[in-house]
Design a protein with these regions (language model features):
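Surface-exposed, low-hydrophobicity beta-strand/loop segments enriched in small/polar/acidic residues
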Residues: 1-179
């Protein structure tokens, strides 16, 4: 029918149902496919990753108007919530490390899990970071470092909280065991 995941030719977003009264989802949070069949926020060690949240679309339960937002508030009562997810299994992402000290070029190629922190309620942006304490070569981890950010303000390995370029290792689209 077509390639799985979405690429630039389709705006790069897949639509996934979200259960009513679900947990809050912030812009660029890691989104996973739960065994319930609904998309939800991924935490450290979660498998079946779909991608990162670009926004949500739903019919507002109070106004009955179609609504797009870059986040989903917890306990949203809408019954038609769709998560709009950057879900290409070959998508590159940038993520800030939680390392308070210097990082090393030798971290490139290693895998890691994320450290989940709820996003900011002032701008609704994800608080997820790369958990530097999990950096190693374990194939069962969530993401793999493929390089340092190309942004000159975020690519100093001697500074705290460097930004890495990563790919998803535990993608639902590449997982052979199912949900």
């Amino acid at each position: 029918i077509r390639a799985y995941g979405n690429g630039y030719e389709s705006m790069g977003l897949g639509e996934y149902p979200v259960a009513a009264s679900s947990d809050a989802m912030f812009f660029q949070d890691l989104i996973v496919q739960a065994a319930t069949g609904f998309a939800t926020v991924g935490i450290a060690g979660t498998e079946n990753i779909l991608g990162s949240l670009n926004g949500v679309f739903f019919t507002d339960a109070n106004t009955s108007k179609p609504t797009f937002a870059n986040h989903l508030l917890a306990a949203n009562q809408a019954s038609d919530i769709k998560a709009l997810v950057n879900d290409s299994p070959i998508q590159q992402y940038e993520i800030r490390s939680n390392n308070a000290g210097a990082s090393a070029q030798t971290d490139v190629g290693n895998t890691a899990d994320i450290a989940y922190t709820a996003g900011s309620t002032s701008n609704f942006v994800s608080g997820c970071t790369l958990d530097d304490s999990t950096l190693n070569n374990n194939a069962a981890q969530q993401i793999q470092v493929i390089g340092i950010s190309r942004d000159p303000e975020n690519n100093d390995l001697t500074s705290a909280n460097v930004v890495w370029r990563v790919i998803i290792k535990q993608s639902l689209f590449n997982d052979l065991t199912g949900v």
